[in-house]
Amino acid sequence: MEWSLTQSKLLAFHRLMRTDKPIGALLLLWPTLWALWVATPGMPQLWILAVFVAGVWLMRAAGCVVNDYADRKFDGHVKRTVNRPLPSGAVTEKEARNLFVVLVLLAFLLVMTLNVMTILLSVAALALAWVYPFMKRYTHLPQVVLGAAFGWSIPMAFAAVSESLPLSCWLMFLANILWAVAYDTQYAMVDRDDDIKIGIKSTAILFGRYDKLIIGILQLGVMALMALIGWLNGLGGGYYWAVLVAGALFAYQQKLIANREREACFKAFMNNNYVGLVLFLGLAMSYWHF
């Protein structure tokens, strides 16, 4: 019986950290890899790459824990989240707080192996991860904070590789914010009706009937900024083909969200994994030396 309870608790932690749903970690991973490849340029040192990949998974898990902790009183009223570990009682509030601390400490131990500039920037990463979940109570723009949180690995990657934060770093950071607002608005469209009832704010609610148009404008902005990064760094034609493929994926997402159906909006959100992958492959191939 004791082992059964332990198994049950571990499974609850697994669900709380969303390790069974890697999409969030992947959306955090791709911009991190973009930054590492542009900053190097090309393949970064294996240890730096390992630190950032592990850090992405740890901080995404920590972000999920603090997000569910912040939303624990709301999630019980939303159909999609009612069975999450905290509202269902599978994990206690104290256990969630302790798990968050452990994950953050592990991530910080990894960052401590890098240079001072990266360590200092990591403090802002922690602050953004902690603040984001609470923003949806006070502003209709929590997706902007999410974009900054998911994109903060970009200046950290540049700092770790080159100890500098050039123009390309901040253009990529801005591109990631636009991209995050676009895809998280798609995600928020799934819960829009429930969020309105319980008082949660989001860009999906703020944009209203202009949601599809604004998402499209944001997606065009992502393409323009990523193309500009390619030009500034002298990337080859293959990279621009990758940007165009990303544009085709954005067009497909627009088709999916056309009728604002919940399942289709969620499918559009999930499709953004391929946008990040395609752009990374374009960068990696541009820096590949045969």
UniProtKB/Swiss-Prot annotation:
* UniProt subcellular location: Cell inner membrane
Pfam families the record matches: UbiA
Could you tell me the EC number(s) of this protein? 2.5.1.39
Entry's PANTHER family? Answer: 4-HYDROXYBENZOATE POLYPRENYLTRANSFERASE, MITOCHONDRIAL (PTHR11048:SF28), PRENYLTRANSFERASES (PTHR11048)
State the organism of origin.
Salmonella arizonae (strain ATCC BAA-731 / CDC346-86 / RSK2980)
The residue ranges crossing the membrane are: 23-43, 46-66, 99-119, 141-161, 163-183, 213-233, 234-254, 268-288
Q: Which CDD domains match?
A: PT_UbiA_COQ2 (cd13959)
Gene Ontology process terms (BP): ubiquinone biosynthetic process
Q: How does it sit in the membrane?
A: Multi-pass membrane protein
InterPro entries linked: HB_polyprenyltransferase-like, Prenyltransferase, UbiA_prenyltransferase, UbiA_prenylTrfase_CS, UbiA_sf
Q: Which GO terms describe its cellular component?
A: plasma membrane
Q: What is this protein called?
A: 4-hydroxybenzoate octaprenyltransferase
Reaction(s) catalysed (UniProt annotation): all-trans-octaprenyl diphosphate + 4-hydroxybenzoate = 4-hydroxy-3-(all-trans-octaprenyl)benzoate + diphosphate
